[in-house]
Amino acid sequence: MRLNTLSPAAGSKRVKHRPGRGIGSGLGKTGGRGVKGQTSRSGGGKVRNGFEGGQMPLKIRLPKFGFFSRKSLVSAEVRLNEIALVEGDVVDVSTLKQAGVITKNIVFAKVVLSGNIDRAVTVRGLSVTKGARAAIEAAGGKIEE
């Protein structure tokens, strides 16, 4: 056995396709690109999202509606079981931030009924749903507006 006589086993290496090199290759003439059109051209086929070939795009044909509430960027929901993470008896926006329940950019928070609360807390300066209010008061807590 010599290094110059080594060769891979028959059938173990696939022959690389060479498009556009004659009809016998199976990829002659059009080279597997089909006939005419944007994707058959060199550099073709890459168009931006929503582009419809010059036709008026659907996004522009439909009417505008609604808006994006900027208050939603500074508002958050707080669950009852997250209030348990706050140390102390008073729960407000600053204590929720210190406990890591809400992020620093939050200005408004609303307490919702999800989970349960087992200790008396005073909720100050937060919106509270009916169900959450009942659960907090049942645990001996109170809500201050």
Curated annotation (Swiss-Prot):
Pfam families: Ribosomal_L27A. Residues 1-52 are annotated as: Disordered. GO terms for molecular function: rRNA binding; structural constituent of ribosome. Gene3D superfamilies: 3.100.10.10. GO terms for cellular component: cytosolic large ribosomal subunit. InterPro entries: Ribosomal_uL15, Ribosomal_uL15/eL18, Ribosomal_uL15/eL18_sf, Ribosomal_uL15_bac-type, Ribosomal_uL15_CS. Residues 21-35, 42-52 have a biased composition (Gly residues). The keyword Ribosomal protein applies. Part of the 50S ribosomal subunit. Binds to the 23S rRNA. Belongs to the universal ribosomal protein uL15 family. NCBIfam families: rplO_bact (TIGR01071). This is Large ribosomal subunit protein uL15. It comes from Aeromonas hydrophila subsp. hydrophila (strain ATCC 7966 / DSM 30187 / BCRC 13018 / CCUG 14551 / JCM 1027 / KCTC 2358 / NCIMB 9240 / NCTC 8049). The lineage of its organism: Bacteria, Pseudomonadati, Pseudomonadota, Gammaproteobacteria, Aeromonadales. The gene is rplO.
